[in-house]
Amino acid sequence: MENSTTTISREELEELQEAFNKIDIDNSGYVSDYELQDLFKEASLPLPGYKVREIVEKILVVADNNKDGKISFEEFVSLMQELKSKDISKTFRKIINKREGITAIGGTSSISSEGTQHSYSEEEKVAFVNWINKALENDADCSHLLPMNPNDGSLFKSLADGILLCKMINLSEPDTIDERAINKKKLTPFTVSENLNLALNSASAIGCTVVNIGAQDLKEGKPHLVLGLLWQIIKVGLFADIEISRNEALIALLKDGEDLEELMKLSPEELLLRWVNYHLTNAGWRTINNFSQDIKDSKAYFHLLNQIAPKGDRDDGPAVAIDLSGFNEKNDLKRAGFMLQEADKLGCRQFVTPADVVSGNPKLNLAFVANLFNTYPCLHKPDNNDIDLNLLEGESKEERTFRNWMNSLGVNPYINHLYSDLADALVIFQLYEMIRVPVNWSQVNKPPYPALGGNMKKIENCNYAVELGKNEAKFSLVGIAGQDLNEGNATLTLALVWQLMRRYTLKVLSDLGEGEKVTDDIIIKWVNQTLKSANKSTSISSFKDKSISTSLPVLDLIDAIAPNAVRQEMIKREHLTDEDKLNNAKYAISVARKIGARIYALPDDLVEVKPKMVMTVFACLMGKGLNRLK
């Protein structure tokens, strides 16, 4: 290690030793690559997942002196010096603590050596198993897999054929996967891989980060990866309606003097917290600030249940009486048990055990509260004529596609609202790095922003983002200023975001073609040549070609790239109604994902022949075709 790196004082050394001991959950005297990566995730660094992995990979080369995949304390100190010298470790504070209910298993990845430890949460596994058992209990396609036993490893085996994952994705975001594309009978290793590809690429399309998960990981049932993916899928479903344009009653959560625009910027987690506090205030109880420390005694939950339970005076069914006698129980665990008995009366006992409440498990308590909200929101839209309801227009399909694309790449923070969450351009910079546009991070203002002048800091970021787009990325950004991004000007923001997505899509292609620049014409030419050489009668003249509305050129191209992937009896070829076209498109998108194409476009994009999204579909398929040739 070079001498120019930061020196570490004795005090810091002692702190590092203490930190190392906390990370080293199995007291083996070293931490593994996986534990390091988790540590980064826990630290509040404004870095996307892919960046964290890059840092870990690069630093392991430097710090892991004896190349055994394990980091000793001495190596850890030199690693910290490296990080400090790169000014990355300012917020390197949160350390993974050893917790009860953590199951450690031997490392199985090719990077990790024998003896490395991957840990997963037993509580999460139990919660997810119970949730899936209930959600899919009546699905005949899953009868050979359900119910799973929450007390053993059957979850990891049951997910291995991909069927359950596909079903859970459709529960969270209906119609994401065309059921006709799922292989259900007489499964072979190949058809199982297809199912897992379909699940992964569909999860990606609904905004789950899957950059470090492969079909093989799911087939092998690697617990930490399986649980991580499952949580993301479940969360998409739980949060789907915690959004003001989908649920106008949330306007009741407006505070005095607050603009609707401000409320609309809140994340689902923040809205849930505000919803709980709305009911706690009505109950005359103190408010909470989190779903961990503040709910451990179950008392807030008792009041919440009492507030939202049907009183029999509205359309939400017969009255349910909440018994508050358990509120005064002295023992926390018993009190939590009594509280959950009351939640059970509302059919909402899912996700937490009494121990999960008392330990303050933030993930599972968040899920518990989201499920309560979805079942009994107990909110009434105020008769307030001052509110501009035009603001409540939901996001367009195009906006949602862009948002899901960004989130699937692991950007940080997660994008809940396309415009307000891009207002400081941090995510734009991360996307620039992914398309190899260098970002000078020392020029970027990072959160938390000051109360006074904070927006100016965000505008400075946006100015830099536009400057990079024009000068480095060579994007066409005529008439776009930093302020437009900051204010969330839809047309101008979308113009930049589309060019980012286009460049990202084409970068994947040019990487396959040894760096050759790829243009629309090259893609169209390749599509037509591939169709012709497979003796297909379809072709396209441009990405606006009306024949694309039938999806037949897409389906024929898939068949040319991956023979037998398309079942011809599923396709309607003549006298197509609008419904036929949509059915073809749904099938085409799902089969494309099944053969491994990471497609973000929606069936409607094909039916309506949206040239931008059509381009991404053909580009992804070209990537798949070139990959197969290699």
From Swiss-Prot:
Q: What is its main location?
A: cytoplasm
The residues covered by the EF-hand domain are 11-46, 51-86
Q: Give the encoding gene's name.
A: Pls1
Write out the entry's keywords from A to Z.
Answer: Acetylation, Actin-binding, Calcium, Cell projection, Cytoplasm, Metal-binding, Phosphoprotein, Repeat
Tissue expression: In the inner ear, it is expressed in the organ of Corti. Abundant in the utricle (at protein level).
Q: What is one GO biological process annotated to this record?
A: vestibular receptor cell stereocilium organization
Q: Which Pfam families does the record cross-reference, listed alphabetically? A: CH, EF-hand_7
What's the protein called, per UniProt?
Plastin-1
What positions does the domain Calponin-homology (CH) occupy?
Answer: 122-238, 266-377, 396-505, 517-626
Give the originating organism.
Answer: Mus musculus (Mouse)
